[in-house]
């Protein structure tokens, strides 16, 4: 049987209409699964004649090229690398209209092309890991927030609460408990898949952090093990350890697959990978992950707990978004959830988006009534209030540079306020790992003094960022700036 080679992948790409025609490239055990922009561009007869191609299946929106066991994953990895590593020279269309969507997309893509460093590519994979989970984070957080509101208004202090309401509150809270009880497994699956391994192997490795190793424990699922060949097991590190195990596990799996005969790949590759990575996880990753987890928690709790550190974090967050490395904060969110019971970093970083809103409003006020800038701001300001900041960043402030800087100043002012309140003894945070960053986040806020105090502090921080971003832009962000 023909081996998967670079020339073979290039032949397939040419036959399916080029890289520009590929939306998504994935695989199952035997098939290269492609989602194409236009199936009509694919030359089916040519594909079938390529050496190593065993067949072609078209199902729903997928174009499936049968390559056989042990080959499909290699082909998918090579094709993805080929598509990422080279620029697509296909002709691009240019629209005459310069609405917000066009401008934002253009500037965003220019920046993305510059993000080629290994560190940026590594951090960008965090989006692949966590983005599919965000709807669940938000849903569970909103349900928990509304349940907590009902609890504080109708249940606490009530000697005879309504039984149905109590059941409803417990029902609304159970989703959050379920999510966080087994979240590590979901992350392990996504992480190993994002780095080129099999998701199920990552999920199994992540489950080692969820299982219990104390037979006398009254909660959790006992693993049946108390030690690993005499080496004590301490499943610390949680999400940090899971990420390390899944990333290394993906590398081990790919290396094992290189030496595994094709006909044994489906049976033995995962077996060998799990045996190797299980031992590495118990002996090395769990202890290291625990130290990193504790260190990360300590560092950001101290940064969050003082106004200067919070101002710096909020002020620089938009720059991290611009370079695509903001997903690197997500493991910190987990560390803070574990240490504090809520995500105290998220509301600080959310001030950055509020600063953008204030800056955009100042630009709107300064621009002429018939200016295109006003149209762009109108199209992006409502999403900005709701915590969706990319249209403002890439379409309004960043192309004009100065307003982007003054927006960062506005975010820093709000971050300073949140940090000051925390320094005075009232840290606030999100009740879930991740959520919306605008006014929609209000029901998800909590604090040591309860949900109402958390909501009030967050709302005040938003207002401060709006005002500071507006004033900084009004006085310092519009001189020699295109307001047309």
Curated annotation (Swiss-Prot):
Residues of the PTS EIIB type-1 domain: 1-89
Keyword Iron: no
Short name of one Pfam family: PTS_EIIC
Keyword Cell inner membrane included in the entry's annotation: yes
Keywords: Cell inner membrane, Cell membrane, Kinase, Membrane, Phosphotransferase system, Sugar transport, Transferase, Transmembrane, Transmembrane helix, Transport
Record domain PTS EIIC type-1: where: 124-484
Membrane topology: Multi-pass membrane protein
Catalytic residues, chain numbering: 28 (phosphocysteine intermediate)
GO molecular function, one term: protein-phosphocysteine-N-acetylmuramate phosphotransferase system transporter activity
Residue span of region Disordered: 83-106
E.C. numbers: 2.7.1.192
Enzyme class: transferase
Biased composition range(s): Basic and acidic residues: 96-106
Superkingdom in the source lineage: Bacteria
Residue spans crossing the bilayer: 126-146, 168-188, 194-214, 232-252, 273-293, 312-332, 345-365, 379-399, 404-424, 451-471
Cellular component, GO annotation: plasma membrane
Subcellular location: Cell inner membrane
GO process terms (BP): phosphoenolpyruvate-dependent sugar phosphotransferase system
Catalytic activity reported: N-acetyl-beta-D-muramate(out) + N(pros)-phospho-L-histidyl-[protein] = N-acetyl-beta-D-muramate 6-phosphate(in) + L-histidyl-[protein]
Role according to the record: The phosphoenolpyruvate-dependent sugar phosphotransferase system (sugar PTS), a major carbohydrate active transport system, catalyzes the phosphorylation of incoming sugar substrates concomitantly with their translocation across the cell membrane. This system is involved in N-acetylmuramic acid (MurNAc) transport, yielding cytoplasmic MurNAc-6-P. Is also able to take up anhydro-N-acetylmuramic acid (anhMurNAc), but cannot phosphorylate the carbon 6, probably because of the 1,6-anhydro ring.
Notes concerning its domains: The EIIB domain is phosphorylated by phospho-EIIA on a cysteinyl or histidyl residue, depending on the transported sugar. Then, it transfers the phosphoryl group to the sugar substrate concomitantly with the sugar uptake processed by the EIIC domain. The EIIC domain forms the PTS system translocation channel and contains the specific substrate-binding site.
The protein's name in its UniProt record: PTS system N-acetylmuramic acid-specific EIIBC component
Native source organism of the sequence: Aliivibrio fischeri (strain ATCC 700601 / ES114)
């Amino acid at each position: 049987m023909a081996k998967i080679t670079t020339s073979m992948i290039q032949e397939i790409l040419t036959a399916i209409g080029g890289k520009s025609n590929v939306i998504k490239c994935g695989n199952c055990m035997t098939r290269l699964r492609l989602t194409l922009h236009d199936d009509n561009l694919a030359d089916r007869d040519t594909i079938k004649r390529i050496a190593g191609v065993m067949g072609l299946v078209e199902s729903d929106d997928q174009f499936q090229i049968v390559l056989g066991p042990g080959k499909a994953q290699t082909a998918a990895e090579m094709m993805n690398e080929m598509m990422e590593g080279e620029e697509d020279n296909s002709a691009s269309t240019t629209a005459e209209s310069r609405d917000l969507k066009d401008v934002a997309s253009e500037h965003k893509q220019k920046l993305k092309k510059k993000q080629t460093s290994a560190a940026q590519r590594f951090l960008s994979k965090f989006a692949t890991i966590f983005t599919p989970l965000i709807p669940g984070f938000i849903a569970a957080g909103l349900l928990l927030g509304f349940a907590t509101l009902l609890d504080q208004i109708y249940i606490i202090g009530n000697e005879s609460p309504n039984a149905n309401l109590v059941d409803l509150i417990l029902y609304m809270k159970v989703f959050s408990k379920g999510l966080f009880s087994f979240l590590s497994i979901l992350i392990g699956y996504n992480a190993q898949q994002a780095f080129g391994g099999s998701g199920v192997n990552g999920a199994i490795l992540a489950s080692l952090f969820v299982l219990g190793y104390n037979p006398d424990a009254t909660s959790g699922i006992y693993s049946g093990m108390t030690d690993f060949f005499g080496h004590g097991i301490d499943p610390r590190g949680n999400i940090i350890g899971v990420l390390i195990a899944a990333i290394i596990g993906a590398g081990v799996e790919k290396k094992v697959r290189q030496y595994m005969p094709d006909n044994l790949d489906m049976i033995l590759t995962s077996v060998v990978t799990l045996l190797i990575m299980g031992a590495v996880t118990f002996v090395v990753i769990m202890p290291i992950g625990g130290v990193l987890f504790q260190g990360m928690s300590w560092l950001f709790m101290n940064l969050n707990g003082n106004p200067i550190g919070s101002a710096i974090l909020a002020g620089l967050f938009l720059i991290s978004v611009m370079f695509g490395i903001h997903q690197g904060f997500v493991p910190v969110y987990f560390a803070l959830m574990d240490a504090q019971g809520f995500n105290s970093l998220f509301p600080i970083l959310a001030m950055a988006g509020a600063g953008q809103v204030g800056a955009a409003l100042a630009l709107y006020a300064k621009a002429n009534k018939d200016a295109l800038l006003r149209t762009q701001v109108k199209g992006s300001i409502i999403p900005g209030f709701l915590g969706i900041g990319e249209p403002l960043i890439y379409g309004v402030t960043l192309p004009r540079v100065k307003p982007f800087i003054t927006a960062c100043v506005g975010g820093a002012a709000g971050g300073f306020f949140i940090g000051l309140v925390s320094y005075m003894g009232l840290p606030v945070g999100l009740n879930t790992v991740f959520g919306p960053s605008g006014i929609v986040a209000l029901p998800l806020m909590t604090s040591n003094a309860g949900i109402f105090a958390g909501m009030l502090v967050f709302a005040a921080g938003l207002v401060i960022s709006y005002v500071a971003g507006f004033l900084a832009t009004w006085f310092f962000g519009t001189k020699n700036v295109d307001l047309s």
